[in-house]
From Swiss-Prot:
Domain of life per record: Archaea
SUPFAM superfamilies the record matches: Adenine nucleotide alpha hydrolases-like
Name of the featured protein: Uncharacterized protein MJ1016
Cited Pfam families: QueC
């Protein structure tokens, strides 16, 4: 399967066979080919596709970890349960609600996803350590900011970005400090453009049920959870989280029924729809009117 021109030119990766070969070589170099892997599984297209690719390579995935909180979409858990059954991998469900409330105290809306990701990464490292596993797999693709950190690490080690070593690195390095063996993060999709991830998803017959939110990457329909729709300068707290869930649950249910995507920013109550059509905004406004009046 050939990859997009962007992936070929910007990440020096031509096709799936090349990616598979590069990944196996990286595992061999780290003497990790037979080691166990723990996967941070969100239930979305990226982590699901990454799991399918890793299984295709014959890598040893021992556990899926699904992090959730009180305001998570039910559909995410459902998708992870399906993946667990499809690939016969046990899943650990881990509730981060209390930790999220603690770490977001006094923080602004713009930092919610960063805080949540850090909590999940910290806990994934802890769980992996308990299981005697040092490789953590994520569904990070070329869209992610961590791509830059991985490239910087490769520059430090090799003097340049060696693209065919991007998938298996000890980035972030803070988790390996003082350890006998470095903690490795395996990102099989880290060089792929979104369109290539979608191609791979089709190739592996991965079907994802959507919540029908707008998502954090306009144009790519990548979903997460309703808390990302807190206004940038809003003070994060439990009351706001409850409101975000209530409003966005209604909005996504309407959007799913009518075949579009919708999300509500709070406390501004800004309505976002994809595609942008007045009729869709009207549908959401009408659905939310009862909430505002109750």
């Amino acid at each position: 399967m050939e990859f997009s021109e962007w992936t070929k030119n910007k990440r020096k990766l031509n096709n799936l066979e090349e990616l598979k070969r590069d990944i196996i070589e990286q595992f061999k170099e780290k003497n990790a080919l037979d080691e166990g892997i723990v996967v941070m599984a969100s239930g979305g297209k990226d982590s699901s596709t990454a799991i399918a690719l890793a299984k295709d390579l014959g890598l040893n995935i021992e556990y899926l970890i699904h992090f959730y909180h009180r305001w998570s979409w039910d559909v995410s858990k459902k998708m992870v349960e399906k993946l667990s059954k499809k690939f016969d991998i046990p899943v650990i469900f881990y509730n981060i609600t209390d930790e999220l409330l603690k770490r977001t105290k006094g923080a602004k809306g713009s930092s919610i996803c960063r805080i949540c990701k850090n909590i999940m990464k910290d806990k994934a490292v802890d769980i992996s350590k308990e299981k005697g596993i040092r490789i953590i797999m994520t569904g990070d693709s070329a869209l992610e900011k961590v791509s830059g950190a991985v490239m910087n690490y490769l520059r430090d080690v090799y003097g340049e970005v060696v693209y065919n070593k991007m998938e298996l690195t000890p980035v972030p390095q803070k988790y390996s400090k003082g350890k006998d063996k470095e903690v490795l993060f395996f990102r099989p999709l880290i060089r792929l453009a979104c369109e290539d991830v979608l191609k791979l998803m089709d190739y592996y017959n991965i079907e994802i049920e959507r919540a029908h939110e707008v998502g954090d990457k306009i144009g790519f329909w990548r979903e997460g959870c309703c808390l990302q729709y807190a206004d940038e300068n809003a003070l994060l707290n439990e009351k706001l989280f409850n409101e975000l869930y209530k409003y966005n649950k209604i909005a996504t249910e309407v959007a799913k029924k009518h075949g579009f995507r919708a999300s509500i920013k709070l406390p501004s109550k800004k309505i976002m729809v994809v595609p942008k059509k007045d009729e869709y905004i009207t549908l959401i406004k009408n659905a939310l009117r009862d909430v505002d009046e109750s």
